[in-house]
Amino acid sequence: MKEKRMRKWCCYITTTILLMFCITNIYAQEFNKYFIDRTLRIDYIFSGNTKEQHISVDKLNTSPRWYGKRQKLSNVPIEGNGQIIVKPHNKQEVIYRNSFSTLFQEWLSYDEANYSTKSFENVFLIPMPKDSVDVTLELYNNRRETVVSLTHTVNPNDILIRHIG
């Protein structure tokens, strides 16, 4: 009787472990389909005042390993004042999304932003794509309306992407 229970218990544990590996593998395939285990650092400049805002790309760097999320890549758990969205080049499928809030957007709420123009550096980390992607950066107002956005293409083979680390 004890031996039968022990076998049942071992079978249950083995099945559970196998299911966990299968589920992990399914999520890993989504990451591995579009990305490699490297980080792409994109430096942006946000500039402007309360009347107009601008986003420009400053530089791109890549470093070893990706330490961010590998599952639910297009889900955003918490909404911020902006989002970075990654799609395969010329396609509509979102393969990575993350939200953020910036000091620039906070500064826009101060009186100084009514009569002065400033610029702020911002850095975003995304997994390194295998192929060319379109990266969209959107900034929202307090009503969740897009006030400024920038879409640019990143080719992972671009010689201007600096390798660091």
Positions of PLM-derived features:
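Non-catalytic propeptide/linker segments at domain boundaries
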Residues: 114-165
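N-terminal prosegments of processed precursors
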Residues: 28-122
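Residue-identity detector for glycine
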Residues: 5, 9, 48, 68, ...
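Bacterial Sec-dependent N-terminal signal peptides
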Residues: 1-32
